[in-house]
Each structure stands twice: as C-alpha cells, then as structure tokens.
C-alpha cells in the first residue's frame, strides 16, 4: 500500500536562478516534481518553487527526504531534509530558503 506525499520546497533570493533537486534516501526523485520561478526585478533575484508528488510506502519509513537548491554561485548547494514517518498521518511540508 502506498500513500501520496505532496511536499513544497521554496528557494528565495537566488542569483542566478537556483535549481531545486529532490532525493529520497540515495534515490533522485526530482523527475516527480514540477518547478516554477519568478524574477524579482528590483533586486534582480529569483524565487523558485518546486512541488514534489511521490507515492511512499512502508519501505520509505525512516528515509531522508532532501530538497537541495543549487546554482553556479553555490555549486555545493543549500539543502534541508526531513525524515519520513510513513506510519503516521500524512501532512504537507513547506521548505523555505532565504538569503
């Protein structure tokens, strides 16, 4: 049995525009995400929003879900992670990166 997980990750204040990458454990799940961005002209920075939709099951319990913001100015990236607790009621998480 699987359950749909919806998670949003937001990177603000990037220049140049960041790309958001998703991993679940060691698995790249970025292809399950949609990304949109806006350019803030006054500061010449970008806000990027990535919405991940993924079917998780019991085997995903305890796995680390990571959103990583990367651009040429920060090639090592900035990231945040949560540990999945698949046995509990599902919630929607929102990650916000600020410069």
Name every feature range the model reports, one short phrase each.
Residues 24-31, 71, 82-99:
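Flexible inter-domain hinge/linker segments at boundaries of tandem extracellular adhesion modules
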Residues 3-7:
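Structural beta-strand segments of beta-rich domains
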Residues 34-84:
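Extracellular beta-strand/loop-rich beta-sandwich domains predominantly from IgSF
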Residues 11-13, 71:
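Short solvent-exposed capping/turn motifs at the termini of beta-strands
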Residues 13-26:
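Solvent-exposed loop segments of extracellular immunoglobulin-like
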